[in-house]
């Protein structure tokens, strides 16, 4: 059976190790998973209440148009319902967009490193991938603009960026949008939008009225704590969204996912409490980094990327043996760093203590050999 040649250059997505797998491998009873940027505080109590009361006819297909959720999200964002495209997580939204816009002879422009699925789906569709290295951990929009040409169909801007947690400032983005050809779609992946609190972080939704070639992606998987339900969405120019709907699988978001997302978006007080606690958790890591002279990127997300002076894979393995799962920077091409999801206060303190011991051990070893 022949498949697309480009599939041979790709690997299936490999998520971080799960809790049960690590328990079995290392014979541990307690595992703290801080690898996948999930919300450690879970989801709103209203979601749990809604699930308990859910009495749907499960033999029936879900609402393919996600009408009720569409109205809820549109009202919350102050956009029109027809500007929304829903998917089974942002992974599917990215797949839909790539499938609709890309083919051999087209290209996409993106940062390196950034979220891997942009590149993955571009290659599947036969498009050329033009990757521009980050500059001081941030998207280099000027260099990215130089890579845009007549055949550029998509420019991906992950803001805040995964895996660095950094962001593109408002004025730099506005200048970029003014210069990108109208034939190229600029997609702002704002999966971590709710955590971004910087004063000059761009508010992109109002810009949709001016830039028809702008699209914004958001998700319920991160700050809303609904990763298990797989639901994300795109916001864009209504005419383009209408065309993209053709690439959407029928009934792609489940009845349960639509219900819990509709309930979650109403509980903004829970969301803000999560954001507040996340900021406090980040501060724990900042204090550790400053005390031990550890490099880190200031984060606008629920994770932090840092370098303690050891290879990322080594730190990953040593922490995992202690029952703490983080993400090595190696899969992103950042061999000397790790990405850690901000956890509960006590979880942060525990992993910081382990990191401090690794730093001390490394410093002592270097002094021995010097």
UniProtKB/Swiss-Prot annotation:
Annotated pathway: Amino-acid biosynthesis; L-histidine biosynthesis; L-histidine from 5-phospho-alpha-D-ribose 1-diphosphate: step 7/9
GO molecular function, one term: histidinol-phosphate transaminase activity
CDD domains linked to this entry: AAT_like
Catalyzed reaction equations: L-histidinol phosphate + 2-oxoglutarate = 3-(imidazol-4-yl)-2-oxopropyl phosphate + L-glutamate
UniProt KW Transferase keyword: yes
Group of enzyme by EC: transferase
Keywords: Amino-acid biosynthesis, Aminotransferase, Histidine biosynthesis, Pyridoxal phosphate, Transferase
PROSITE patterns recorded: AA_TRANSFER_CLASS_2
Required cofactor(s): pyridoxal 5'-phosphate
Modification N6-(pyridoxal phosphate)lysine, positions: 222
Biological processes, Gene Ontology terms: L-histidine biosynthetic process
PANTHER family the record matches: HISTIDINOL-PHOSPHATE AMINOTRANSFERASE, HISTIDINOL-PHOSPHATE AMINOTRANSFERASE 2
Family listed: Belongs to the class-II pyridoxal-phosphate-dependent aminotransferase family. Histidinol-phosphate aminotransferase subfamily.
Oligomeric form and interacting partners: Homodimer.
Name used for this protein in its record: Histidinol-phosphate aminotransferase
Source taxonomy: Bacteria, Bacillati, Bacillota, Bacilli, Bacillales
Gene for this chain: hisC
